[in-house]
């Protein structure tokens, strides 16, 4: 009988089976929560890919039907009326090549960007693709969306401990104005006082602006801020909104009818930049987004020229 990794993972939806396999690794509450989550999930997400890959590795390749290897194929590869006879060894070689085509490749060089966001299981998955490869790893712990960055870093060190390492530090920030980055630095240093932050060398003379409004007027205020910024920059205006507020804020932005206004969630903003940014409800970003203050730090560093925050409280301000 053949087992697919997807089916094996779904077996864990049975709490009794999960409890037996987990032994002392999970508490009864964790067993119930995990089993319930698996049973209630119709489709796997990107977060499950590393688990499925691990299971595929443990299960191994499907066995080959050796009976067919002993047969001769007298009619394969007809050319100019000549019958090509495939020997058993040739057939096995072709079967092995076909199997290898379905296996993860091993790469000579592996490049990992946003390395701070990889989980321990994802590091295991990636290193299987290049156990003897050279690596380029780019990351910033201050921007990690993983709940425990130290755990993820330890996993990376464990997986790549056999490799010689050369570290380089990014010392200059060219993206953000000095005014914007100074404020973002204040925010992240409340959580990571030892954060290794680069120096922003470009000044605009414009400080970030923070607007406090009534709770029911946040969406309207976000739209007003976007309109103002459209008049001040030639490029794009990013409006970064907690996912739960998108149904309220998105219609307001749609009424503006300007394609330069782009609404994204905090996690969607990673790796992006805008000429100006409106940050909606920073407190909600901290409380609702994986990574908390680190996620807010990412959001605050998306703007190259101007930054406006719109919030109903001042709790988040440094």
Each model region followed by its residue ranges:
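Conserved helicase NTPase catalytic core signature
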Residues: 1-109, 118-123
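Conserved helicase motor core of SF1/SF2 NTP-dependent helicases
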Residues: 56, 60-63, 75, 79-85, ...
């Amino acid at each position: 009988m053949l087992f697919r990794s997807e089916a094996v993972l779904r077996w864990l939806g049975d709490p009794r089976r999960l409890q037996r396999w987990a032994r002392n690794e999970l508490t009864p509450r964790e067993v119930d929560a995990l089993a319930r989550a698996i049973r209630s999930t119709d489709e796997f997400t990107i977060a499950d890919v590393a688990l499925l890959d691990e299971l595929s590795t443990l299960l191994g390749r499907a066995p080959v039907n050796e009976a067919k290897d002993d047969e001769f194929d007298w009619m394969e590869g007809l050319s100019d009326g000549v019958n090509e006879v495939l020997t058993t060894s040739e057939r096995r070689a072709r079967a092995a090549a076909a199997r290898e085509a379905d296996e993860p490749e091993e790469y000579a060089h592996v490049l990992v960007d946003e390395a701070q966001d990889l989980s321990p299981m994802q590091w295991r998955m990636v290193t299987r693709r290049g156990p003897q490869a050279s690596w380029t790893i780019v990351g910033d712990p201050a921007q990690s969306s993983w709940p425990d960055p130290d755990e993820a870093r330890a996993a990376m060190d464990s997986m790549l401990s056999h490799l010689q390492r050369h570290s380089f530090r990014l010392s200059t920030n060219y993206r953000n104005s000095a005014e914007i980055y100074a404020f973002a630095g204040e925010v992240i240093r409340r959580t990571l006082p030892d954060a290794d932050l680069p120096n922003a060398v470009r000044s605009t003379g414009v400080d970030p602006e923070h607007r406090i409004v009534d709770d029911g007027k946040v969406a309207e205020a976000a739209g007003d801020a976007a309109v103002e910024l459209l008049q001040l920059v030639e490029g794009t205006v990013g409006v970064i909104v907690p996912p739960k507020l998108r149904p309220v804020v998105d219609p307001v932005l749609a009424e503006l009818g300007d394609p330069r206004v782009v609404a994204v969630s905090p996690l969607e903003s990673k790796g992006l930049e805008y000429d100006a940014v409106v940050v909606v409800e920073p407190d909600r970003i901290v409380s609702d987004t994986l990574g908390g203050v680190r996620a807010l730090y990412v959001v605050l560093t998306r703007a190259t020229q101007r930054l406006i925050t719109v919030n109903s409280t001042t709790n988040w301000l440094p």
